[in-house]
Amino acid sequence: MKRRVFLGLPVILGILFYIWYIFHASDNVAYSDYIRLVNSYLPDVTNPAKFFVPDILTRVPITYLGRIINVKLFGYNTYFDMTLGVLSLGAGAAVLALYAERNRSVGYLSFLLIQFVYFSLNKWEMLYNGTGWAHFLAFGCFFYNYYVLERVYGSGGEKKGAMARL
């Protein structure tokens, strides 16, 4: 239990720091990629024709759902996208914590360094980018997939329900 608390604390502190940082270092103003979003998608956010365009392969489909929720519930708020970015980043960090908790060979100092690098501010560009949160979510899903693969095929043998998750 003590190890679990220690491993979860950097994740929670990282999320809280980023939330604080976003609300103190940015404004709820459309800039950068948000200009493109506002001009091309927001006038008719639920129009499927805006989704099925020639460059559909360069777009992450989950962003459309996020954009619809943002426009319908918040009238389009850039903080919503940035907060989704922080939560998605936190999801990836939580999976790293789960892995470290299961794999006892990851020491406390190593884990803290991994979390420090994972939450480093070099990700700021992706946080204020209107669709960066989907990429962080994809990273977290990739880490989770690796975690489940390791549970199924790793040295510890298969855990209950791990194959179903895979």
Which role fits each region the language model picked out?
Residues 22-25, 70-73, 119-129:
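Juxtamembrane "helix-exit" motif on the non-cytosolic side of transmembrane helices
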Residues 83-107, 111, 144-148:
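Transmembrane-helix motifs of polytopic, lipid-linked glycan transferases
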Residues 1-18:
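Start-transfer (signal-anchor) and selected internal transmembrane alpha helices
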Residues 33, 60, 106-153:
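Membrane-interface micro-motifs in multi-pass membrane enzymes
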Residues 18-57, 67-71:
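Extracytoplasmic loop-helix module adjacent to an early transmembrane segment
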Residues 65-89, 104-105:
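Juxtamembrane segments of multi-pass membrane glycosylation machinery
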Residues 147-166:
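Short hydrophobic alpha-helices at membrane interfaces in multi-pass membrane enzymes
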